[in-house]
């Protein structure tokens, strides 16, 4: 399975996945609105044949009276690929992109009160908190929970990871300079320098600097149907 940033050519297949999985559906222009306005924030999950089996459609909220924050418009995973942790990985990727590109402080979403699988995922696995109940939010009259996830901890982890990478880069440069002084050789080739850097960064970072993407790969939601029913009706 591969998770990557959504591209314009993916939007029609994302819409098809949405129609298969969710009661909340959107016109194609709404997908293009997200893709063109916030191209960094939406992600797709694809199988070994490159077929889209899940997606997250996300955006930034434009509220000048609030801190920067993102919003999950829609999340879906096809039934054939649920219980693989894909929903969690898609959500984490989108949240990470919100931090890196827009300095988001939190992310919000809406979920049907009756969607127990999605509530379990959001509350127990992704640390969303219910902020309020919005009566008759959905077109069929069902209420929605408005939920928020604080992104401070994820932002701190990203910052530490970048600091470790920068520290490793300085260690590599120092090692190269020492070798040059000791041997009197010319500068190493770019390939040699890259190999030096990879080895030293791995030694320096140890277990504590594990890439966040690796963390999400090993962490799967438990007893969750991967929440492909979770979505926002997107006002």
Swiss-Prot record:
Transmembrane parts of this sequence: none
Alphabetized InterPro entries for the sequence: Acyl_CoA_acyltransferase, Ard1-like, GNAT_dom
Gene designation per UniProt: NAA10
Span list, region Interaction with NAA15: 1-58
Location within or outside the cell: Cytoplasm; Nucleus
Chief site of localization: cytoplasm
Residue(s) carrying N6-acetyllysine: 136
Modified residues (N-acetylmethionine): 1
Name the UniProt record assigns to this protein: N-alpha-acetyltransferase 10
Record's function text: Catalytic subunit of N-terminal acetyltransferase complexes which display alpha (N-terminal) acetyltransferase activity. Acetylates amino termini that are devoid of initiator methionine. The alpha (N-terminal) acetyltransferase activity may be important for vascular, hematopoietic and neuronal growth and development. Without NAA15, displays epsilon (internal) acetyltransferase activity towards HIF1A, thereby promoting its degradation. Represses MYLK kinase activity by acetylation, and thus represses tumor cell migration.
Biological-process GO terms, alphabetical: N-terminal protein amino acid acetylation; negative regulation of maintenance of mitotic sister chromatid cohesion, centromeric
EC number(s) recorded for this UniProt protein: 2.3.1.255
Organism expressing this protein natively: Bos taurus
Origin superkingdom: Eukaryota
Keywords: Acetylation, Acyltransferase, Cytoplasm, Nucleus, Phosphoprotein, Transferase
Family under the similarity heading: Belongs to the acetyltransferase family. ARD1 subfamily.
Keyword Acyltransferase part of the UniProt annotation: yes
Subunit structure: Component of the N-terminal acetyltransferase A complex (also called the NatA complex) composed of NAA10 and NAA15. Within the complex interacts with NAA15. Component of the N-terminal acetyltransferase A (NatA)/HYPK complex at least composed of NAA10, NAA15 and HYPK, which has N-terminal acetyltransferase activity. In complex with NAA15, interacts with HYPK. Component of the N-terminal acetyltransferase E (NatE) complex at least composed of NAA10, NAA15 and NAA50. Within the complex interacts with NAA15; the interaction is required for binding to NAAT50. Interacts with NAAT50.
């Amino acid at each position: 399975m591969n998770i990557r940033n959504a591209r314009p050519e993916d939007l029609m297949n994302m819409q098809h996945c949405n129609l298969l999985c969710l009661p909340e559906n959107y016109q194609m222009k709404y997908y293009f609105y997200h893709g063109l306005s916030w191209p960094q924030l939406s992600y797709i999950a694809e199988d070994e044949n490159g077929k889209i089996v899940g997606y997250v459609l996300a955006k930034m909220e434009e509220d000048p009276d609030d801190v920067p924050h993102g919003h999950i418009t829609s999340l879906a995973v096809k039934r054939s690929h649920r219980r693989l942790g894909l929903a969690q990985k898609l959500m984490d990727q989108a949240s990470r992109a919100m931090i890196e590109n827009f300095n988001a402080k939190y992310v919000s979403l809406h979920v049907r009160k009756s969607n127990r699988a999605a509530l379990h995922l959001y509350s127990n696995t992704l640390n969303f908190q219910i902020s309020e109940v919005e009566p008759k939010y959905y077109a069929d009259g069902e209420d929605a929970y408005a939920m928020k996830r604080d992104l401070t901890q994820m932002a701190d982890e990203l910052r530490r990871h970048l600091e470790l990478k920068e520290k490793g880069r300085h260690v590599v440069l120092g090692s190269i300079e020492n070798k040059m002084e000791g041997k009197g050789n010319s500068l190493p080739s770019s390939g040699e320098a890259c190999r030096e850097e990879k080895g030293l960064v791995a030694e320096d970072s140890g277990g504590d600097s594990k890439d966040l993407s690796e963390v999400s790969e090993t962490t799967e939601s438990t007893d969750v149907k991967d929440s492909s029913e979770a979505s926002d009706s997107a006002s």
